[in-house]
Amino acid sequence: MILGIDEAGRGCLAGSLFVAGVACDDQTALEFLKMGLKDSKKLSPKKRFFLEDKIKTHGEVGFFVVKKSANEIDSLGLGACLKLAVQEILENGCSLANEIKIDGNTAFGLNKRYPNIQTIIKGDEKIAQIAMASVLAKAFKDREMRQLHALFKEYGWDKNCGYGTKQHIEAISKLGATPFHRHSFTLKNRILNPKLLEVEQRLI
């Protein structure tokens, strides 16, 4: 049994970070590959939501999704939030798996406690369980940004999913940041305008 872990929203200027873990055996993973599973970035939103539903309802699949808000990212830092989320998944899902595979090149120092962790660069293209985790994390992120788009349409979150596209950066420059922006990220990019009041009034 393999536990695959991946994230969505790491490099976004707005919204939460989602880290997902999916545990299943290779036989079950093969079923998802036959359904068209691949790296979530190469799937249409419709296909991602379809696969998300199949993953969540499959009797032989264990899954965990951890959310870290923009506020938590600003308070603790992105690296700390990633580590805490992965740790939470391992604490919940470790008993289900004899192998743990994380997308990327860092185990966040957790390999001391969990020696069966393996980090795999582009793991979402190589390991089905990581691809399944990628699908879950991305579906959760997509859904969140669509919901936030209903509150703040000018930022184009339904299309850019919180990433720093030209339209998104121009909207921040013009309107200021919302309470859902990561201020630590937007300040770093020198695009944060202190016009918070204008957009915050809509939440009152």
Curated annotation (Swiss-Prot):
GO MF annotation list = manganese ion binding; RNA binding; RNA-DNA hybrid ribonuclease activity
Q: Which Gene3D superfamilies match?
A: Ribonuclease H-like superfamily/Ribonuclease H
BP-aspect Gene Ontology terms: DNA replication, removal of RNA primer; mismatch repair
Enzyme Commission number: 3.1.26.4
Keyword terms, alphabetized = Cytoplasm, Endonuclease, Hydrolase, Manganese, Metal-binding, Nuclease
Family membership, please give it: Belongs to the RNase HII family.
Question: This protein is called what?
Answer: Ribonuclease HII
- In which organism is this protein found? Helicobacter pylori (strain G27)
Give the RNase H type-2 domain ranges: 1-197
GO cellular component, as recorded? cytoplasm; ribonuclease H2 complex
Localization, per the record, is:
Cytoplasm
Q: What does the note under cofactor report?
A: Manganese or magnesium. Binds 1 divalent metal ion per monomer in the absence of substrate. May bind a second metal ion after substrate binding.
Q: What function does this protein fulfil?
A: Endonuclease that specifically degrades the RNA of RNA-DNA hybrids.
Known catalytic reactions: Endonucleolytic cleavage to 5'-phosphomonoester
- Which superkingdom heads the taxonomic lineage of this protein's source? Bacteria
Disulfide pattern: none
* Names of the cofactor(s): Mn(2+); Mg(2+)
The record ties this protein, via SUPFAM superfamilies, to: Ribonuclease H-like
Record: residues binding a divalent metal cation: D6, E7, D103
Looking up Pfam families in the UniProt record yields: RNase_HII
